């Protein structure tokens, strides 16, 4: 689902995360630029059964993106436009919450290669 983005004080920063992020629906577009917040996911148990255990390096594989990759690569999924939550951006948040980040191109490539490698291994393991 979509979400509004609010600041520490509860003031609206963005009315729509999906619009702010220019979110894409396709699998490969999301590998290029992950477009959704994990706190807005709803998924069936069978996806979690495949996703767990998460790949070991949590800096190169966030659980949000991992669950999305498992779901999008092997199952059908739907994005609903309703804003079901307001996502609060704290100054110390780990994720950027859709805002620009300063990670290097090297890190972005390493991150995606790590995710795809583990995704391929998992798909072979579960014969997906």
Where are these regions (language model features)?
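Hydrophobic alpha-helical membrane context
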Residues: 14, 76, 100-102
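Conserved donor NDP-sugar-binding/catalytic core segment of glycosyltransferases
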Residues: 1-13
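Conserved nucleotide-sugar donor-binding catalytic segment
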Residues: 22-98
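Short, flexible, mixed-charge acidic loops at enzyme active sites
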Residues: 12-20
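Catalytic core of nucleotide-sugar-dependent glycosyltransferases
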Residues: 19-31, 87-91, 96-128
């Amino acid at each position: 689902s979509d979400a509004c983005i609010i600041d520490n004080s509860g003031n609206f920063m963005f009315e729509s995360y999906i619009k702010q992020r220019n979110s894409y629906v396709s699998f490969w577009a999301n590998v290029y630029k992950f477009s959704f917040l994990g706190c807005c996911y709803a998924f069936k148990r069978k996806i979690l059964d495949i996703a767990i255990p998460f790949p070991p390096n949590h800096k190169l594989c966030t659980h949000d993106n991992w669950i999305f990759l498992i779901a999008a690569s092997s199952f059908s999924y739907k994005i609903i436009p309703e804003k079901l939550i307001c996502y609060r951006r704290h100054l110390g948040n780990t994720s950027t919450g859709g805002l620009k980040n300063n990670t290097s191109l090297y890190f972005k490539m390493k991150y995606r290669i790590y995710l795809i490698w583990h995704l391929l291994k998992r798909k072979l393991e579960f014969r997906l």
